[in-house]
Amino acid sequence: MKLLAIKVECSYELEDGLSFFMQDELDAQGIESRKRSDFVLEGQKHDSSLVELDDIENLPEDLELTAYFEYKNADKKKIIQKITDKIAEMKGYGLDAGNVSISTKEVADEDWNTAWQKYYHVIDFSRHLAIVPEWEDYQPAFSDQQLIRLDPGLAFGTGGHTTTQLVLLAMERALVKPMSVLDVGTGSGILAIAASKLGASHVLGTDISDEAVTAAKENIALNNIDNIDVRKANLLKDIDEKYDLIVANILADILLELIPDLDNHLNENGKIIFSGIDYLQLPKIEKALEENNFVIKMKMQEGRWIGLLIARKPN
């Protein structure tokens, strides 16, 4: 099967929003995100044989985002126009699009299935967690370091993005055994797996995408974990249970939809972790939390991305 690859070179500020749009709205079969800084820094830190420096030199200074579509069903001109319109919309929110360039090419499906693996390598996140591709042999750097093994497949998170790492950082601080955890928008399942590894008694991961549910289940199986359930759900709809910790690494506009339903799904003294928030969108998140009787206990920032640890206001 042939695939149509549409490559967008732009500012990293568009990464989350544009990735979500191409996957969710345009039904991309896969998303590949590459930044020169990611590979150079990780290559220097881990000396990974998966990092090919010759290829790095060909990367743009900012972001290269490639979406893959089934060739026979793809309307190339229509897709490019929709991407162009979305970029214009995001610029209207105040995001810097950088120097935008869009190009296309045909690729063989079998080439994609293995070629992307060379860009995915160990992320030695902390003394407690390391994210490891399932084909790599990696020994923990610390005796108590937990390994999260992932096969990211065609799409979904690999743990390398700042927004994911902000959640992991907050989870290391906030998750206490034996908390129950709800991961809204689980994607690859990385946060659900991390919660289990950090001592959660039970974890539920939800996603609106059938493909994400399948990917998460496969990654959970790779880690031999039996206390995580995954189901298809739209945010908190059809979720009846309450949890000690709710995590959501999704776009700010979707977090705004989530906030009014949080109280009904949070146990007494429960906590919430948000990420995926561009700093320009933080004021409206803060306003919605205030209006729904929540208070921010900890704020984390890396670049323009914000992570929040949230609790109910004290009585």
Curated annotation (Swiss-Prot):
Top enzyme category: transferase
Keyword match Cytoplasm: yes
Reaction equations catalysed: L-lysyl-[protein] + 3 S-adenosyl-L-methionine = N(6),N(6),N(6)-trimethyl-L-lysyl-[protein] + 3 S-adenosyl-L-homocysteine + 3 H(+)
Keywords (A to Z) from UniProt: Cytoplasm, Methyltransferase, S-adenosyl-L-methionine, Transferase
Localization terms from the record: Cytoplasm
Domain of life: Bacteria
GO annotation, cellular component aspect: cytoplasm
CDD domains the record matches: AdoMet_MTases
Record-listed S-adenosyl-L-methionine binding positions: 164, 185, 207, 249
Gene Ontology terms describing biological process: methylation
Database matches in Pfam families: PrmA
GO molecular function, one term: protein-lysine N-methyltransferase activity
InterPro entries: Ribosomal_L11_MeTrfase_PrmA (IPR050078), Ribosomal_PrmA_MeTrfase (IPR004498), SAM-dependent_MTases_sf (IPR029063)
EC number: 2.1.1.-
Protein's job: Methylates ribosomal protein L11.
Cited PANTHER family: ELECTRON TRANSFER FLAVOPROTEIN BETA SUBUNIT LYSINE METHYLTRANSFERASE (PTHR43648:SF1)
HAMAP family per record: Methyltr_PrmA
Similarity comment: Belongs to the methyltransferase superfamily. PrmA family.
Name of this protein: Ribosomal protein L11 methyltransferase
Organism: Lactobacillus johnsonii (strain CNCM I-12250 / La1 / NCC 533)
Lineage, uppermost ranks: Bacteria, Bacillati, Bacillota, Bacilli, Lactobacillales
Encoding gene (name): prmA
